[in-house]
């Protein structure tokens, strides 16, 4: 996945934590990895890898890889380390979202699954998809925002 986040991001890095979901609000909280979380059956372990691709100093285009796959994981995990996804109205920064909307006409979160690689060994009925790769171009609003970052075209087009 690729995402456009707030700030200049150092990396690459791997981050860990625990995710706890509030069913009433459909929102998750990221907790630091500690003994208390390990004992809480509702706190699920999460691990996310990311690598900055390019930046304009105010925003960074990241490549993100889920090691665990939890609902809202990328959005909440990046927000918890101070780099929320632009256009994310649930976990994002209101000022960043406002700028993305006003300057780049962003209407949704700047998170894009550009490539999906299927595992080689799959059972029926998906066996025929084993080893295949699927790609999708980013939406126009994603491209508009990314275009402000020097070198973005090396990573997305």
Q: What is the role of each PLM region?
A:
Residues 1-157:
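RNA pseudouridine synthases
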């Amino acid at each position: 996945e690729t995402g456009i986040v707030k700030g200049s991001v150092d990396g690459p890095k791997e981050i860990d934590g625990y995710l706890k979901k509030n069913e009433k609000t459909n929102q998750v909280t990221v907790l630091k990895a500690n003994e208390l979380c390990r004992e809480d059956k509702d706190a699920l372990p999460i691990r996310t890898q990311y690598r900055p691709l390019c930046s304009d100093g105010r925003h960074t285009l990241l490549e993100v890889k889920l090691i665990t796959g939890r609902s809202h994981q990328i959005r909440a995990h990046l927000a918890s380390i101070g780099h929320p996804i632009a256009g994310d109205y649930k976990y994002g920064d209101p000022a960043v979202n406002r700028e993305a909307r006003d300057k780049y006409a962003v209407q949704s979160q700047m998170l894009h699954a550009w490539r999906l690689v299927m595992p080689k060994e799959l059972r029926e009925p998906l066996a025929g998809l084993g080893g295949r790769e699927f790609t999708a171009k980013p939406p126009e609003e994603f491209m508009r925002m990314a275009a402000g970052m020097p070198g973005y075209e090396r990573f997305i087009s």
